[in-house]
């Protein structure tokens, strides 16, 4: 039993604001240059073809195309943007 009733409760009740991390564009989705694909802390996903990396490890598209996630032989996950060739009819 607590000796004083509210001793602990006044020290609780704080939490940090969520950072909205995670995948923003999933595999197969269309992107244009500049679109954010993944927000992350550290390099959980590494940049592949046509993908840039920001100073906070955000991955973003460098060209228009389709997002692709793949795991290479070194067991790292890579995010690439595959350019889509548009056919004119």
Curated annotation (Swiss-Prot):
Record PROSITE patterns: RIBOSOMAL_L27
Protein name per Swiss-Prot or TrEMBL: Large ribosomal subunit protein bL27
Annotated GO CC locations: cytosolic large ribosomal subunit
Signal peptide stretch: none
Family label: Belongs to the bacterial ribosomal protein bL27 family.
Sequence segments annotated as region (Disordered): 1-22
PANTHER family assigned to the protein according to its UniProt record, in alphabetical order: LARGE RIBOSOMAL SUBUNIT PROTEIN BL27M, RIBOSOMAL PROTEIN L27
Keywords: Ribonucleoprotein, Ribosomal protein
One Pfam family linked to the record: Ribosomal_L27
GO molecular function, one term: structural constituent of ribosome
Organism whose genome encodes this protein: Bartonella henselae (strain ATCC 49882 / DSM 28221 / CCUG 30454 / Houston 1) (Rochalimaea henselae)
UniProt KW Ribonucleoprotein keyword: yes
Coiled-coil regions listed: none
The UniProt record lists the keyword Ribosomal protein: yes
HAMAP family named among the record's database cross-references: Ribosomal_bL27 (MF_00539)
GO biological process assignments: translation
């Amino acid at each position: 039993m607590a000796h004083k009733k509210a001793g602990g409760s006044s020290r609780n009740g704080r939490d940090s604001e969520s950072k909205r991390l995670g995948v923003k564009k999933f595999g197969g989705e269309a992107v244009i240059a500049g679109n954010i694909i993944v927000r992350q802390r550290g390099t959980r996903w590494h940049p592949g073809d046509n993908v840039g990396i920001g100073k906070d490890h955000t991955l973003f598209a460098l060209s228009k195309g389709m997002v692709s996630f793949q795991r290479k032989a070194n067991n790292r996950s890579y995010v690439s943007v595959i350019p889509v060739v548009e056919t004119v009819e």
